Amino acid sequence: MKNKLNVSFVLGIRNAERTLRECLNGILMQNYPKEMYEIIIVDGNSTDSTLSIIDEYMNFNKNLILMHNPKKLSEGRGMSKDLGIKAAKGKFVVLLDHDNIILGKDWLNQMLSPFNDKSIMASQSLLDYTKGDSNFIKYVNTLGVEDPFATPYSLVAQVVLHPNKFRIINDYYIHELNPRHVLFGGANGCVFRKEVFEDINGYTRDVDVFASMADLRMKVAVPLNPRVYHKTSSDLFNFMKKKGIYFYRFIKNDYKIKKYNWVERRASDKLRFLLLVLSSLSILPSLITSLNQVFKTGKFFWLLHPFYVFYISLEYIIISLFNIKNFLHYYLR
């Protein structure tokens, strides 16, 4: 950009000792004047060495700000990310999680480049893996979405799988969000104009933010080159365990307070959701997708895709059956 504008990195964290150093190092190595950005960390009452790590970095970085959230949660109105965004002074807000590691020194400049177009309201990063990663980690980072069941709803995953469906301007894809079929983003390195959160009345959750942006038909860029590494669970078992816990919390209570409903009120949306479940269990559609990616990229880790989609879908179905009343309320409302 011709004029470097103020940027606020916002991290909502709790017990982040495993990856926090790598996350902060990725931010601090950017080819961007340190006086032109701030790092706001909102801690949710960490009980490990997270706070001592933050203190260590604050001794050498005056642009690092620590806030506290006694309610512990990072997402939701009045929670860590929302508090950090409200305190942000930058014209642009970068949302990162503590296990997001920026790859390359020019990531921030490349992510800001699309904002030369005044109609672009957010810039979503693609993901990549690092040398020595397991095939599972390579797959998750290349697909760009933690939950493969949500692939049809993920902006990053759709760009990866179907790039020809998106228009390219200069060095980024451009997508106008559509309330009839929201492709969501917002996690793993997403940059927003600060005014977005003013227009949608604050931050709640990544998916809800994009749903609110879609109501206003906002445009999102996906730059071709910059990448973030999501240092997530190292194996399939731990990952399935984590996703199961998240989904259990969702169907038990969280669905009641989310703006975005995966199963919208229209009959066509409910039918599309059922077809998605059936196709996920049949394996064939996701197998075709994985084979296409193997032939296109030569990366054999794509062969994990149909099996992971099947197992995660089966896990969600089992959890839903044990909470059938809540699921029916969610599906039929």
Language-model features, listed with the residues they occupy:
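Non-catalytic, C-terminal membrane-associated alpha-helical segments of glycosyltransferases
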Residues: G244-Y248, W262-R333
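Short, flexible, basic/aromatic active-site loop/helix in glycosyltransferases
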Residues: L143-V182
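Conserved donor NDP-sugar-binding/catalytic core segment of glycosyltransferases
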Residues: D106-L155
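A conserved acidic beta->alpha catalytic loop
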Residues: D43-S52, D97-I101
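N-proximal low-complexity "stem/linker" segments adjacent to membrane-targeting elements
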Residues: M1-M29
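A short, conserved alpha-helix in the catalytic core of glycosyltransferases
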Residues: F184-G185, G189-C190, V196, N201-P226, ...
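Glycine-rich, basic loop-to-helix element that forms the pyrophosphate-binding segment
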Residues: P70-A88, Q110
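Short aromatic/hydrophobic "clamp" motif used to bind/position activated sugar donors
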Residues: V93
